[in-house]
Amino acid sequence: MQVNTLDSSSRRTFLQRSVQLAFTGAALPTVLNLAAMADAAAFSAPAGSYKALVCIFLYGGSDYANTVVTYDDPSYNAYNTIRGGGANQTAGGIAFAKAALTPTLLMPVTPLPDNRQYALHPAMTGLTDLFNNGKAAVQLNIGPLVVPMTKVQYKGSNRTLYPLPPKLFSHNDQQSLWQSSSPEGSTVGWGGNMGDLALSSNTKAIYTCISVTGNSVFLSGDSALAYQISTSGAVKINCVSSNVYGSANVKTAISQLLQQQRTHILENEYNIVTSRAISAEGTITSSIATGQAADGAGSATTAGVGTFLPFTSTALSGNSLAQQLKMVARLIAARNSLGAKRQVFFVSLGGFDLHDNLIAGQNTNMTNLNNALTAFYQTTVNLGVANQVTSFTASDFGRTLTSNGDGSDHGWGSHHIVVGDAVNGKEFYGVAPPVSVTDTTSINDQWHVGQGRLLPTTSVDQYAGTLATWFGVNPSSVNGALSELDTILPNLQNFNNVTGTSGIYYPRNLGFMQAP
């Protein structure tokens, strides 16, 4: 095949073909657009410092009542009755037997009011150990809120003073609200906005926001874009990494076309960003190669020699979240060669929309979450960065406390877990919700909006703001201007250390992270 002399029509054909071939790498759409990556960040990481946030998104809506399970006798008995359990604290319906929860009982430093107690799902023994050893915390009853809200205000009609989050109970919209504070269609997330501020702290800005689970609005910023990577490594651009149509000559021709300067602005921009994407893939591949080659060897804690040993457990076989977190650990190990001082990662686990088969389905999910997250935490210890890497869970929404027979339905508020040595661990944060599903004027019925769907007493903005402050985002106003934190989380101003009409306090910083 003769390809060394190409007229303009042929060049266009090859360029179009190279676009089609390149886009077979799923990461390319977000990898290619590197525009504005050199924008100055609003904060600068101190020399030698490193911090990373890892968002673990549980797609489908995590069942709060069987994840962080109420344990004190009065609350447990109410839970057991509502969820179809038997008498005398035995299992039944979709309730756990109390005896099954004893090994995962959480022992906080500060007891909860009214002697409330919680245990984690029986499969979460590793996370129980992390909590009881001060390496994890539980934030109670979080969900999207625009302003502090009571049940009376929720049921009322004054949406000017008490606006509701849009499209409650909808998967796509609530996923987007959690990740961006806006419903489906939002283009910018709070993880990406943190990345915007951190760009100039990193010498290679493209590695600021990295997803190991495909595209998400969470990592999209105004300037920062999500670099997508697979669990096997950087996604190669096919037409320049291997022969095309079995021909090395075609590959060479396309490579030349992609590197030539063009007079047409779109062709030239395509060449520039594709060349940068090729370079980025090469950097990622070489940076993680050493650790990847030596996985599980020995027991030393230097990168690449036993560092990733926790991920070799047979218990992690087939665990997609573990594979994602293993890649995150490899990237963190390569942080110096990637020029990174601040990074935000996004991983996920699906299968939480359990309208039926809740007990079996959630057992699989919680086993995978427990095993993956504990392996990842231990790997950060091995890397010497456990106090510099914070992982946290998020999900579409919580679910109903009532059973629909074999599962639970879409809800609102939920409980979430934060892990890392920078966490003020062995504590519960927020307000423990009453265990009730009835609709009366009793105080116990004021914090659900029907069937035990929790009305959040902590907003996602407070949760995000606490994480962002530790990450280095400035929470303070300068010369009367809006603070960095309020810029990326506009609704946070509505939770600025205020006491709601219910008497519940909404702190700007929830306190579960150490000072930055």
Regions found by a protein language model. Give the residues of each.
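Active-site lining segments that contact anionic ligands and/or coordinate catalytic metals
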Residues: 342-344, 386, 394, 411-414
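Generic beta-strand/beta-sheet core signal
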Residues: 348-350, 392-394, 419
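Histidine-centered active-site microenvironments of extracellular/periplasmic hydrolases
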Residues: 395-428
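Metal-dependent active-site segment of extracytoplasmic phospho-/sulfohydrolases and closely related
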Residues: 373, 380-405
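Feature for exported/extracytoplasmic and membrane-associated proteins, marking the mature portion
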Residues: 2-371, 375-382, 427-516
